[in-house]
Amino acid sequence: MNWLKTLAAAAALQAAVLAPAHAGENLSAVKAAGALKIGTEGTYAPFTYHDADGKLVGFDVEIGEAIAKKLGVKAEFLEGKWDGLIAGLDANRYDAVINQVGITEARKQKYDFSEPYIASKAVLIVRADDESIKSFADLKGKKSAQSLTSNFGKIAEGAGAELVGTDGFDQSIQLVLTGRADATINDSLSFLDFKKHKPDANVKIIAEQENADYSGVIIRKGEPELLEAINKALVDIKADGTYQAISDKYFGQDVSK
């Protein structure tokens, strides 16, 4: 029986050694390291991208920096492709991912999310001088510029629109501007970013869906202290005006709700 005791002791020791690495950095370890390691794409403007000088910038980048500052550490960004970004948490590559990660029930089964820090809605975009479309229902029989496989395309199709296929937001907007499409259903944040850079563009939001999609900071399960600290940091940056300043910089308005 001694060999069973030895085996059990060895297994317990191995579990103790492996647990911190498997569970990932906790709040104490983050503070001891002096850095919050954050996974992000770096290719998804205006959230996380490189400016003309090659510097990593964006809404999510500044939110990450603000959170880290409230934790008393620096933000250390580690870039990766979207397909493997969240899996990087499992590999213990970083402490959190801040990259417009939508809060879904499927993801919540495996990971923990902070409170939402940004909201987006499906909005109906038309030319500014178009008075024929005032609601999603008015799309019936109209041409809507959409990525054919997107949820937005399904919404337009469900409203009775004739879909005009596009590669994404920019092409959809151009088709509306040039009159080759009557409208597009797209993401509210993408539209705000577009209008921030082209305020005189002849397009407007005429309707929006009531239900918003929310994104949060995603971390490994089993790190309640880190999660609590991140949530407190989010509350604090909203209270002291930091969030509003970042939001205004990239979108011209508060995008938290």
Language-model-detected regions and their locations in the chain:
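Periplasmic-binding protein-like
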Residues: A119-V126, L192-V235, F251-K257
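Acidic, polar ligand-binding/catalytic clefts
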Residues: E65, K69, K74-D138, N202
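Extracytoplasmic small-molecule ligand-binding "clamshell" domains
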Residues: E25-N99
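Short Pro/Gly-enriched coil loops immediately N-terminal to beta-strands
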Residues: Y111-V123, K140, E157, G168, ...
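Short helix-initiation/N-cap motifs at beta->coil->alpha
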Residues: F77-A87, E131, L148-S150, V164-T178, ...
